[in-house]
Amino acid sequence: MAYPFQLGFQDATSPIMEELLHFHDHTLMIVFLISSLVLYIISLMLTTKLTHTSTMDAQEVETIWTILPAIILILIALPSLRILYMMDEINNPSLTVKTMGHQWYWSYEYTDYEDLTFDSYMIPTSDLKPGELRLLEVDNRVVLPMEMTIRMLISSEDVLHSWAVPSLGLKTDAIPGRLNQTTLVSTRPGLYYGQCSEICGSNHSFMPIVLELVPLKHFEKWSASML
């Protein structure tokens, strides 16, 4: 969950998000080192009047500044490709949930159950209870079992939407006429909030997403009560 004046990412709740945080730190370190080197060279150029004339034609220098950036790009690309393949990999999901974007709410269907569907609307500010979050609470939460592989099928009934939950490292476009999929695995129980992340009209900011991750026994009781 985000908090006021937060500068970093939300706490990782899935293996994918943990990998993304590590990749972010890895890349940020490379960017910091490159920026420091460039600033150091610029400061030297501005503070000295000496000129090394042979540097302009040095083949060794040209070789270094060609090979070194290539190595740096490889060091960035390889971890990125690994995470991309991990995000696309879906092996034997325990549960499949289909979500459809509408103007301006989400609908959910648990495809492993015969008749378990519902719509999820934002709760207006005037109806919020003490302790609830403005613009983030919904009337029907998406209850899912933790520590299990869940496949999310995402599409749209009207315009472009995007189903995003930052703490789980999820952001998948909901495109009319196309079915996208993503994997969801939570390592701990709790409430996880997200929002539509694609501008979709006047009420775009009123499309929150709330996932309630619970132990399997609690999920079985909830699903039985919904049928």
UniProtKB/Swiss-Prot annotation:
Family: Belongs to the cytochrome c oxidase subunit 2 family.
Catalytic reaction annotation: 4 Fe(II)-[cytochrome c] + O2 + 8 H(+)(in) = 4 Fe(III)-[cytochrome c] + 2 H2O + 4 H(+)(out)
Cofactor(s) annotated in UniProt: Cu cation
Membrane topology, from the record: Multi-pass membrane protein
Main location: mitochondrion
Matches recorded under Gene3D superfamilies: 1.10.287.90, Cupredoxins - blue copper proteins
Stretches of the chain found on the membrane's Mitochondrial matrix side: 46-59
Subunit structure: Component of the cytochrome c oxidase (complex IV, CIV), a multisubunit enzyme composed of 14 subunits. The complex is composed of a catalytic core of 3 subunits MT-CO1, MT-CO2 and MT-CO3, encoded in the mitochondrial DNA, and 11 supernumerary subunits COX4I, COX5A, COX5B, COX6A, COX6B, COX6C, COX7A, COX7B, COX7C, COX8 and NDUFA4, which are encoded in the nuclear genome.
Chain sites annotated for binding Cu cation A2: C196, E198, C200, H204
Annotated compartments: Mitochondrion inner membrane
Positions annotated to bind Cu cation A1: H161, C196, C200, M207
Name of protein: Cytochrome c oxidase subunit 2
Keyword set includes Repeat: no
GO biological process: ATP synthesis coupled electron transport
Species in which this protein is naturally found: Ceratotherium simum (White rhinoceros)
Residue positions binding Mg(2+): E198
